[in-house]
C-alpha cells in the first residue's frame, strides 16, 4: 500500500509541475514551445509567509496573490478587485503557546510577535472585530483560486507554498487539491534556464551577462555558487526588493523578476545552454525529494 501511495504521489507531482524532471534539459526554444499550451491561462503569482517550515507545527501568517494574463510572457495584471488577494492572519492559540514555551528568549520578544501578523492601524480599520483566522483566509484563498479562469499557480520554490497551503487546508477539512492545477516553479526557471544562459553568455564575453553572473555569485560553506534566490536575481535586474518577505511585495517582486527572465530568454532563445543546464539537471536529480525555504 505504501508503494502504491508513493507511486500515486509521484504521478500527481509529475502531472502538476509544468517544468517537471522529464523537461529539465529542454532548450530555451523548447521551453517557449511548451509554454504556448498555457498562453491563454490565468497565471496566479502567489506567496505565503509562515511561522516556520513545517505545516504540521507552524501556521500561515500571510497569503498574497496577483492574477495575470501571460501577454507574450510580460504578464498583464487582471484589472479588477478579484485579480488580487492579500490578507494577514491572526496567530492561532497554539502558535502563541509555542512562542511562550520557546527556550529562545528572542521568540518571546514583542517585536517578534509583531513580525508574525500583529495588526497594523490599517488592519484594525479593516477588521474592527479583529484579524481573520487561518481557516477563514484559507477558505477565501481557495474561493479566489476557483474564481480564476484556467489557473496556473506560480511561485518561487513552489513546492513549499503548495505543500504548506495543502497541509493547512487539510487540517481544517477545506476541500482543495492544490496539485490539480498546473504549477510553474520560478526557481526551476532560474536554475535550469536563466542561470545556464547567463553562464553561457558570460563565457562568450557578454559583459551584461558577466555583470549579472557576478551579482548572483555567492560564497557558501562549500565554495562559490550561483544563487537562484528571488532577492539576488531581482536585484541583478534592478527590481525593487523593498519589503522582501511580505507576501504581496514578494508576489510583485516575483512578477517583475519573471518578466525580466523571460525577456532575457527570448533575446537569446537560440543559444545552446546544454553545458551548464545538463550539470544542473544532474544535480537536481541527485538530490533527494524535498525543498528548501532558503531558495525564497
PLM-predicted stretches and their roles:
Residues 1-40, 293-296:
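Charge-dense, intrinsically disordered terminal/linker segments
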Residues 7, 11, 27-34, 140, ...:
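Charge-rich, solvent-exposed alpha-helical interaction surfaces
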Residues 22-34, 206-222, 235-236, 248, ...:
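Acidic two-metal-ion nuclease catalytic site recognized across multiple nuclease folds
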Residues 23-166, 227-236:
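Conserved non-catalytic scaffold segment of RNase H-like nuclease domains
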Residues 53-55, 191, 256:
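Conserved protein kinase catalytic core
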Residues 90-127, 186-252:
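Active-site-proximal helix-loop-helix substrate-binding element of RNase H-like nuclease domains
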Residues 160-184:
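Substrate-recognition/cap helix-loop segment adjacent to the acidic, metal-dependent catalytic center
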Residues 168-172, 192, 196, 236, ...:
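Active-site catalytic microenvironments for nucleophilic, acid-base chemistry
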Amino acid at each position: 500500500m505504501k508503494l502504491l501511495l508513493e507511486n500515486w504521489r509521484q504521478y500527481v507531482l509529475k502531472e502538476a509541475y509544468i517544468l517537471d524532471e522529464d523537461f529539465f534539459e529542454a532548450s530555451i526554444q523548447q521551453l517557449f514551445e511548451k509554454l504556448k499550451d498555457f498562453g491563454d491561462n490565468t497565471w496566479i503569482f502567489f506567496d505565503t509567509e509562515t511561522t516556520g517550515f513545517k505545516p504540521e507545527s507552524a501556521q500561515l501568517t500571510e497569503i498574497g496573490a496577483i492574477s495575470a494574463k501571460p501577454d507574450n510572457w510580460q504578464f498583464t495584471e487582471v484589472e479588477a478587485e478579484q485579480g488580487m488577494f492579500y490578507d494577514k492572519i491572526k496567530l492561532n492559540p497554539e502558535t502563541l503557546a509555542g512562542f511562550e514555551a520557546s527556550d529562545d528568549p528572542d521568540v518571546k520578544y514583542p517585536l517578534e510577535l509583531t513580525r508574525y501578523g500583529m495588526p497594523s492601524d490599517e488592519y484594525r480599520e479593516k477588521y474592527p472585530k479583529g484579524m481573520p483566522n487561518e481557516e477563514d483566509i484559507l477558505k477565501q484563498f481557495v474561493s479566489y483560486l476557483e474564481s480564476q479562469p484556467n489557473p496556473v499557480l506560480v511561485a518561487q520554490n513552489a513546492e513549499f507554498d503548495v505543500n504548506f497551503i495543502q497541509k493547512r487546508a487539510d487540517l481544517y477539512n477545506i476541500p482543495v487539491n492544490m496539485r490539480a492545477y498546473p504549477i510553474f516553479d520560478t526557481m526551476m526557471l532560474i536554475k535550469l534556464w536563466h542561470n545556464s544562459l547567463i553562464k553561457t553568455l558570460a563565457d562568450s564575453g557578454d559583459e551584461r551577462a558577466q555583470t549579472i553572473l557576478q551579482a548572483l555569485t555567492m560564497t557558501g560553506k562549500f565554495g562559490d555558487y550561483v544563487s537562484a534566490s528571488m532577492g539576488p536575481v531581482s536585484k541583478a535586474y534592478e527590481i525593487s526588493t523593498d519589503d522582501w518577505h511580505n507576501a504581496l511585495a514578494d508576489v510583485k517582486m516575483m512578477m517583475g523578476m519573471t518578466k525580466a527572465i523571460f525577456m532575457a530568454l527570448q533575446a537569446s532563445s537560440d543559444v545552446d545552454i546544454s553545458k551548464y543546464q545538463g550539470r544542473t539537471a544532474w544535480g537536481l536529480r541527485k538530490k533527494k525529494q524535498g525543498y528548501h525555504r532558503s531558495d525564497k
